[in-house]
Every structure is written in C-alpha cells, then in structure tokens.
C-alpha cells in the first residue's frame, strides 16, 4: 500500500479547478482512456500578456492523477506561459509534499499536458512520433520523445524508474528491451563529466548491464527473457518473462547470473527477481 501525503489526499478529495473552462484558448490532451490514464488541461490565456487567467482540468485516472492535475492548475494560474513552461513534474510532486515513486508518472502527465496546451495556444503541433520506429510502449502509447524528456528532466538511470515515471513497460513487458536500448542511447548522449555514482547510478551498473547482455541470448534461445530493473547496494533486481517466468529453473537462472556477476565484479552480488 502506498503512503500519500496529507496534501495529496486534500487535492484528491477536494480537487481545485476540476471543471471545463469556458472559452479556453489553450487545450492540452495527453494519455488515453484505453490505457487507464487521460488528462485534458484547459487554459484561458490573455492574448496580449500571455498570462494564464484560468485553468481547469478533466482527468480519468487514479487519485494521484487527480491530485497532480489539481496542483498543476494552482501552480500556473496568474503566471505567463513562459513562466508556466518552466514548471517541472518534480515541482508538481514537491507541491504535493511528494508522490510514491510508482505514481510519479502522474506528475509527468501533468507536465506533458501543460506542454501540449502551450503548443496549442501558439498554433504549433507537437511532434507525435508514433511511427513504428518511435513508439516504444504499445500498451500505454509511450513514445521515445516522452521517455527522453522524463529521463533528462528527472535523472532516470534504470528501467524501473522509467516505468514509474512514464508507465512505459508496465503492461505486457515486451518493450523492456526497447526501453533499455533507448535509455542507454539517451544516457550515452548526456555529458560525461558527471560520475556515475554522483548521478545516482550504482558503481557496478555497467558491469551488470554488460553481463546480462552476454547472458540474454542464451536465455532467449530457451524462450525466455531477462531485463534489468535496478542495482542497489550489491543487490541486482531483474524481471523474468517468457518461459523464465515462474519456471522450475528460475532459481538456477538467477544463481547463474549471480555467479557471473561475482566473477566480473570481484565482490558479492545478490540477484533477485521482481
């Protein structure tokens, strides 16, 4: 059971600005009803000053989605579009005195809706790169651009964090490999001046990534698959799918990976399945 702050509960039970804004001239739609999360953000913006005079929302989702949308409207009313555009999903979460890690995607959805509304006001069309080469998660309709912004804005480094912040990979899990590849590419493009440990990444992260990459072809040959979720304090958490999920050989597969990791790192590593 997740622990919610009193402020989250307040904005859930008493949402601010949960209404349709008449004569809205900036509307942003994100998410999908079929995916279980959808948000429409409506703004009335002064055309001359670009000050947001009124904001309202309609959302379909969990309590955190309602609270995040409510908080967002409180944060942006009275500010110019330029000022509002600088608001991050972390500021939305902070305004609510925090959100559970598994619910951070709700604050990201609010930021994405604001981004879409500002583009709508300016007559611009956000690039929805949903062609086969860019759509990463079909279950939740999450594209590479969405993942890239979440990673860069929040310093994400693991598959588990991407799932929590975007919902990508939270369904059938078949896109985990695509997410890992996209994550690796995004991280590789970031400045290399920040040490891995300082960015929140475990010092053994790369060794674990390389080891799993070497073992995956053998696992896939037997109809299974493995994805890295996190590396924390010598504990490696992975997800198993396909024939590996719940099979009698699961413990042997984890022990095999554990042995390989200890050989590579020269220290004790515990491997567990999520």
Swiss-Prot record:
Could you give the cofactor binding note from the entry?
Binds 1 [2Fe-2S] cluster per subunit.
Phylogenetic classification of the source organism: Bacteria, Pseudomonadati, Pseudomonadota, Gammaproteobacteria, Enterobacterales
In which residues is [2Fe-2S] cluster bound? 137, 139, 172, 175
Cofactor(s) the protein requires to work:
[2Fe-2S] cluster
Species name: Klebsiella pneumoniae
Protein role:
May be involved in the formation or repair of [Fe-S] clusters present in iron-sulfur proteins.
Q: Which family does it belong to?
A: Belongs to the NifU family.
The organism's place on the tree of life at top rank:
Bacteria
GO molecular-function terms, A-Z:
2 iron, 2 sulfur cluster binding; iron ion binding
> Which NCBIfam families is this protein grouped with?
NifU_proper
* InterPro entries (alphabetical): BFD-like_2Fe2S-bd_dom, BFD-like_2Fe2S-bd_dom_sf, FSCA_dom_sf, N_fixation_NifU, NIF_FeS_clus_asmbl_NifU, NIF_FeS_clus_asmbl_NifU_C, NIF_FeS_clus_asmbl_NifU_N
Q: What is this protein called?
A: Nitrogen fixation protein NifU
Q: GO BP, one example? A: iron-sulfur cluster assembly
- Taken from the record, one Pfam family name reads Fer2_BFD
Q: Which UniProt keywords apply?
A: 2Fe-2S, Iron, Iron-sulfur, Metal-binding, Nitrogen fixation
